[in-house]
């Protein structure tokens, strides 16, 4: 099965060209993207190479994506089912609920079902973006929600973004410097 979509569907963020990367992430000699494909509420596994998806399907369905300047093409295996008669979904957004800037304090998010976000890797040394996240805000109440199918992070309460994101070289010193910068940030780390 294959679908080709215009890149305009994704706007300025295309999860099928967005690689998972960052401090303490080991890609194991293959690319991993923040995009995903779902069949009836379950995700398929990203294949490392297109040939893996073109082979007969095994027990676990696979998908693979390619992005050029105009189009995104996604191949997927749907063993034993016609995807045109099932619920097939893809990620198109990085987050579901995430403020556009830090300092959006005292927000309550209660009673929602939130799914399918193409979130980046969220080490303690980079801006932590989740399917739902506070973006360096305080006083939030996040309760009685269903949060699922986020590539890297479901709920993120952590770090603001800065030019030092993912530059710690996986060291304790880099981690400590991140904490020092958090205390010195324009919106300081406080209760």
Each model region followed by its residue ranges:
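Extracellular polysaccharide-degrading/modifying enzymes targeting complex plant/algal/animal polysaccharides
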Residues: 1-136, 141, 148, 154-157, ...
């Amino acid at each position: 099965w294959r679908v080709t979509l215009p890149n305009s569907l994704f706007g300025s963020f295309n999860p099928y060209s967005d690689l998972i990367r960052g401090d303490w992430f080991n890609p194991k000699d293959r690319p991993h993207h923040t995009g995903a494909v779902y069949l009836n509420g379950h995700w398929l596994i990203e294949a490392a190479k297109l040939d893996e998806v073109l082979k007969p399907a095994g027990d676990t369905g696979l998908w693979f994506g390619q992005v050029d300047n105009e189009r995104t093409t996604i191949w997927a295996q749907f063993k034993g089912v016609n995807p045109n008669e099932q619920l097939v979904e893809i990620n198109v957004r990085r987050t579901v609920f995430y403020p556009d800037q830090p300092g959006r304090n005292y927000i309550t998010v209660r009673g929602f079902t939130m799914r399918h976000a193409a979130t980046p890797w969220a080490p303690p040394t980079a801006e932590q973006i989740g399917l739902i996240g506070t973006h360096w805000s305080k006083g939030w109440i996040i309760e009685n929600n269903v949060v699922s199918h986020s590539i890297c992070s479901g709920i993120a309460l952590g770090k603001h973004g800065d030019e030092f994101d993912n530059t710690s070289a996986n060291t304790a010193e880099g981690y400590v410097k991140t904490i020092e910068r958090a205390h010195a940030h324009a919106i300081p780390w406080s209760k």
